[in-house]
Amino acid sequence: MLNSWVVMPACLPLVRRRCTTCTSERFRASGRFRVNAHHKLLDVWLLVLCTSCGQTAKLTVLERRNVRSLRPELLDRLHANDPALTAELLRDPVMLRRNRAALDWDGAWRLDTGGSDHLDREVIDIAVRFAAPIPLRPVRLIAEGCGLSRAEVERLLAEGKLVSAVRLSGKLSGDFTFTLKR
C-alpha cells in the first residue's frame, strides 16, 4: 500500500543576502510592503529585516510599473500587507534572482507522515509530495520520516534496500516516491 508524506512550510523562510551594516547574511521577511508612486508609475518593495542588527533592506517586487497595468486585487493586497502575498513572492524565483537573494529553509518546513503505523512493515512504499518548492535532501526526509539516522539511510541506499526513480543523493524540491525494504 502506498503511503503519502507531505512536506509543508511551517513558517516563512529566511532570506539569504548580505547585510550592508553588519556581516550577517540572514534576513527575515517583515511582511510589509513599501509602495511608492511617481505620478502614474509604481515601485513596490518587500521589506526584510536583518536577523543580527535589525537593519531594514528592500527586495524589489515591481519597478516603474504603470498603475493601470496592475490588477486592483494585487494593489489591494500590497496595501494591506497580505502575508499570503509575502509567501508567494518569496517563492518567486524571478524576484529572488533579480534581488540576488536566496532562501534558507532550515527550520521553516515540517514533514507530515500521517502516523508511524506503516513503519513496521517489511516493505514500505511512500510518495512524498511537496506543498511548496522547498529544496531538501531526500535522505534527510527519509531519515526524519522513518526515525532513522542519515548514516543508516545512506547504508540502506548503498545496499539497494532503498530505491527510487529519482536520485536521492542531491536536493529535490519536487514530488518523488521511494521503496524501503527492511
Segments (PLM) and residue ranges:
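A generic structural signal for beta-strand entry/edge sites
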Residues: 43-45, 123-125, 175
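A cross-kingdom feature marking charged/low-complexity
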Residues: 116-117, 179-182
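Sterically constrained small-residue positions within well-ordered secondary structures
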Residues: 10, 41, 117-119, 169-171
